[in-house]
Design a protein with these regions (language model features):
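FAD-site-proximal beta/loop scaffold in flavoenzymes
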Residues: 1-18, 95-163
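Rossmann-like NAD(P)H-binding beta-loop-alpha module
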Residues: 16-42
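Cofactor-binding loop segments of dinucleotide-utilizing enzymes, especially the Rossmann-like FAD-
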Residues: 26, 49-52, 158
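Rossmann-like dinucleotide-binding cores of NAD(P)H-dependent redox enzymes
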Residues: 34-78, 189
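A conserved FAD-binding loop/helix module that cradles the flavin
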Residues: 159-181
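Residue-level detector of conserved catalytic or cofactor/ligand-binding positions
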Residues: 184-191
């Protein structure tokens, strides 16, 4: 019973996660997943983070805590089984380097597991499209309404802003859609 965050968030009503679920990840998307799962009947939900902190915004994390999400830090998933997830403890050095602590493997029981970890941007489009500019993180460079470095080409969502909440991505995408609509009206009215 393993799912990916994006699939779960698209239609959480079709998933039955059971009483106990684990979310692997501690970013904004993981907070969305955790809160949604609790609202859909999961009683025990734990979010696991590799590091000693939550990468989600303070706002998102505080609401997740209020809704009953438990956070477990410095754990690396080793294996997902039909009984849950085996994690190993991690030591975090001052420079942020993480190292496994041998002998600390432990099974955390779960009916379901949702993977909500950051994924790097897909570079297929940028690698094959001349003059489409990206920043150092591989995200599209745009203006405030999503126009890219190529006239008539727009970009939105995580490809521009990086990992954010679904609400933020949708709000920005609406702004971009309005700009695209305005551009299409200009082209339609031109002879």
């Amino acid at each position: 019973n393993v799912h990916y965050a994006i699939n779960y968030l698209q239609n959480p009503d079709v998933y039955h996660l059971g009483e106990r679920a684990i979310v692997i990840g501690a970013g904004n998307a993981a907070m969305d997943v955790a809160r949604t799962a609790i609202r859909h009947g999961t009683r025990h939900l734990e979010c696991f983070s590799l590091s000693s902190h939550i990468t989600a915004s303070e706002y998102e994390a505080s609401y997740a805590k209020l809704e009953g999400v438990n956070f477990i830090f410095n754990k690396k998933p080793l294996e997902i089984t039909d009984k849950g997830v085996v994690f190993i403890d991690l030591n975090e050095a001052e420079d942020g380097t993480l190292t496994e602590i041998p002998g600390t493997e432990k099974l955390y029981p779960a009916d379901s597991v949702i993977v909500s970890i950051s994924q790097g941007p897909c570079t297929t489009i940028t690698d094959s499209t001349k003059d489409l500019k990206t920043n150092t993180r591989g995200l599209f460079e745009t203006d405030e309404v999503g126009r890219t470095s190529i006239p008539g080409i727009f970009a939105s969502g995580d490809a521009v802003k990086g990992a954010r909440t679904v609400v933020e991505a949708v709000a920005y995408s609406k702004t971009v859609a309005e700009a695209m609509h305005e551009l299409s009206l200009i082209h339609i009215s031109e002879p």
